[in-house]
Amino acid sequence: MPREVILVDSQLGNLDSVEHALIQVGASVHITADPDRVATARMVVFPGQGSFGATTQAIVDGAMGAALRMVVERGDPFLGICLGMQMLFDQSDENGGNAGLGVLPGQVKRFPTDMPAGEQPGARMLKVPHVGWNDVQPTNEHFYFTHSYYVVPGQAEDVMWWCRYGRVEFPATVARGNVFGCQFHPEKSQWSGLRFLRSFILGGRG
């Protein structure tokens, strides 16, 4: 029997590709923007694209933020994707500083713009945002990223997989108890992304 997953519609990005990927790995997906429906969910996926700002602050301070915290505190499996992962943390420097949900300790900071692509003199500077395929450790699999900001975790043990962009090493995935997050887009990461989602759906973890 397919596992029911609540996919949160928080106006933070296109849900279609995430929904399709979840269906591919055997989930029964229900999209909702209703905090009451989210609060009673037994498995939640919280995707997001874009930036911290007025929309994310309204989520954090409002009924949806309370519903998301309720799922976490009850112990049901919860996955944040991209901005949805970043929002699990305490605070972001983006747009003058905005609070996150405070589920995990840590800050969200912008990639520096002065990172050379190599060690040779005159090497080109890496572009921000970080867009494209990159490998994660220790799995050595490749996933698709698109982000200008990254998490600086308050506790290194919350990090499951790491990724490197220039001189910055950042969490590709985080995990604590029933809470999981991925900075990459599993729905855009082909078979590696589907395997990650299938592992979450089947076992409540990434």
Q: Which residues make up each language-model segment?
A:
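Glycine-rich nucleophile elbow surrounding the catalytic serine of serine-hydrolase chemistry
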Residues: 82, 86-88
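Pocket-forming structural segment of enzyme catalytic cores
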Residues: 91-167
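Short, glycine/acidic-enriched loop or turn micro-motifs at the edges of active sites
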Residues: 12, 85, 150, 188
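Beta-strand-turn-beta hairpins that frame and shape the catalytic cleft
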Residues: 3, 140-141, 175-180
